[in-house]
């Protein structure tokens, strides 16, 4: 009788395969933050699509659970209210609802991490830490003007600017804060002194990067996270049986003066003491110019909320609302497509009742979880990361970007896991395939419509001629196509009616000077003198310098009020 052969793979082969899977999944969490792809009319599209592809791959590689029913209800309510606010305009509410669906899928992954224990939860910590450390290095190279050799894998901004591949200093700072939470958790759950020394070094690098960002949002995150961590560390040391140990409170609190010392030194090293590089200390002293300040922005948004308090202006309508409004006081001078405060943004676009339902639902979830009683180290990490994103959302809009949607969903699932994972485990492959299909189609369509924004010699061969006609029928990026069509069309007596109608639609997508000029010129040719004068008045109020430039160029037309 022959010898029986085992069907079980030897441990020596299983272990490398398991490690390879862990490395792959860690990379999938980190990659959205590191994606260097930027092309076409909307710079964050590729980052969002890469985030969806990584999310789909994570769904396929598991583990997948299911968040609590309250989470499903909260996300579903948000999607429903957004869709109802822009009923019929798929290009407006569709992307927002897809983003909410992506967050929902990420919550299933977060719940799966809980079910697989601490080892699986380290996926989130390691992925965010890798992204944070790589971005910190890129940011410091950018800060000192040394990133040029790495283009196109990163950007090379002006001296003294650091933002990695996120292209915005507050997003960069929030990533550093997420990585700071990861370092603290990994330190607390590790017994190896060598590992702890490595994590301490990583923490110093993150601290330097945070100072280089000159982000006031990042400073608030650092102060709050470090302060809470020091309090937890003190509580740990009051009991002699604590299993997990953060660094001593005195060392944690030392990072705060160290941060300010680094913030003082960095610009002097970059600018040679000439003052050419703005420091964090200067930003805290001077703040933003009055007509660019958040306080003025929020006053304008509150005025808009008061005009439509119950139903809002509609999803995606803030930019048009701000342009068309006449304020009694000062006016925020830029195109305002976000309120830079999530509750206020929901109120101005969806209405106060919808904002109360969405924000109140989230607050109910938080209060029911009682974070102030939390002792589990994995959940403490989740609370820290969630806090960094929530704080940022009170000052800007990180949840409009794929990497932060992914981490936000993972944290929600980790903190509010459901009881049963079986239904979602079965649905995960289908959700992953759907995400890949949507991302693939959107990527193809975006490449196609982006051709009109390129010089003829840089376009794909099949789009070199008659480009606009070939890309006109886009289902996802219809606004970008119509914007290109409008700006490329000369207004004549023959096409004035069509241009006027198109300009009116595009005003709700991007109410910028070149669109306003087309609207005024077409109204003039159609004999709508009063409409042209009213629009010119709005133009002068919203963009005075652009209006003056246009008047100098068209002094003989006589349509100014």
Q: Language model features by range: what are they?
A:
Residues 28-32, 202, 337, 341, ...:
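Loop-to-helix entry and N-terminal half of a specific, functionally important transmembrane alpha helix
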Residues 162, 225, 262-298, 378, ...:
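Flexible juxtamembrane loops connecting transmembrane helices in multi-pass membrane enzymes
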Residues 182, 221-229, 378-429:
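Transmembrane alpha-helices of multi-pass inner-membrane enzymes
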Residues 212-213, 218, 233-286, 429-430, ...:
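A membrane-periplasm/extracellular boundary helix in multi-pass inner-membrane enzymes
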Residues 352-380:
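Hydrophobic transmembrane alpha-helices and their immediate junctions
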Residues 440-514, 518-519, 531:
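Membrane-interface segments at or immediately adjacent to transmembrane helices
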């Amino acid at each position: 009788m022959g010898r029986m052969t085992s069907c079980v793979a030897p441990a020596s082969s299983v272990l490398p395969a398991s490690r390879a899977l862990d490395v792959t999944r860690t990379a999938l969490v980190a990659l959205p933050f590191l994606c260097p792809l930027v092309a076409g009319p909307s710079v964050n599209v590729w980052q969002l699509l890469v985030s969806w592809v990584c999310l789909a791959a994570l769904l396929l590689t598991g583990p997948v659970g299911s968040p609590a029913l309250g989470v499903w209800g909260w996300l579903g309510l948000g999607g429903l209210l957004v869709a109802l606010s822009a009923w019929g305009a798929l290009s407006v509410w569709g992307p927002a609802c897809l983003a909410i669906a992506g967050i929902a899928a990420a919550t299933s992954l977060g719940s799966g991490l809980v079910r697989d224990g601490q080892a699986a939860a380290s996926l989130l910590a390691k992925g965010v830490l890798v992204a944070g450390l790589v971005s910190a290095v890129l940011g410091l190279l950018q800060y000192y003007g040394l990133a040029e050799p790495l283009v196109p894998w990163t950007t090379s901004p002006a001296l003294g600017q650091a933002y990695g591949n996120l292209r915005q200093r507050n997003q960069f700072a929030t990533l550093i804060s997420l990585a700071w939470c990861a370092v603290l958790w990994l330190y607390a759950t590790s017994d190896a002194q060598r590992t702890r020394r490595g994590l301490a070094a990583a923490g110093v690098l993150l601290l330097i990067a945070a100072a280089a960002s000159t982000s006031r949002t990042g400073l608030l995150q650092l102060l709050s996270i470090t302060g809470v961590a020091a309090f937890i560390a003190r509580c740990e040391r009051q009991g002699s049986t604590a299993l997990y140990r953060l660094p001593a409170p005195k060392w944690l609190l030392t990072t705060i003066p160290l941060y300010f010392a680094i913030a003082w030194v960095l610009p002097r090293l970059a600018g040679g003491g000439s003052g050419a590089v703005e420091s964090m200390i200067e930003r805290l002293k001077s703040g933003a110019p009055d007509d660019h300040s958040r306080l003025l922005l929020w006053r304008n948004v509150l005025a808009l909320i008061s005009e439509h308090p119950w139903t809002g202006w509609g999803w995606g309508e803030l930019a048009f609302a701000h342009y068309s409004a006449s304020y009694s006081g000062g006016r925020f001078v830029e195109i305002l497509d976000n309120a830079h405060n999530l509750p206020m943004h929901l109120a101005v676009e969806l209405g106060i009742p919808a904002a109360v339902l969405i924000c109140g639902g989230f607050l109910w979830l938080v209060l029911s979880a009682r974070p102030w009683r939390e002792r589990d180290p994995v959940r403490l990490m989740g609370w820290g990361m969630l806090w960094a994103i929530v704080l940022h959302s009170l000052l800007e809009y990180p949840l409009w970007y794929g990497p932060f949607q992914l981490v936000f969903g993972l944290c929600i699932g980790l903190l509010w896991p459901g009881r049963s994972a079986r239904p979602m485990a079965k649905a995960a492959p289908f959700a992953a395939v759907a995400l890949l299909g949507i991302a693939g189609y959107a990527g193809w369509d975006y490449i196609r419509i982006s051709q009109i924004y390129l010089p003829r010699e840089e376009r794909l061969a099949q789009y070199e001629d008659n480009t606009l006609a070939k890309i006109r029928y886009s289902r996802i990026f219809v606004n970008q196509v119509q914007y290109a069509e409008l700006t490329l069309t000369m207004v004549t007596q023959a096409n004035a009616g069509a241009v006027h109608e198109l300009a009116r639609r595009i005003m709700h997508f991007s109410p910028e000077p070149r669109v306003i000029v087309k609207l005024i010129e077409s109204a003039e040719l159609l004999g709508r003198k009063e409409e042209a004068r009213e629009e010119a008045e709005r133009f002068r109020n919203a963009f005075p310098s652009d209006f003056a430039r246009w008047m100098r160029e068209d002094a003989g037309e006589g349509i100014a009020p």
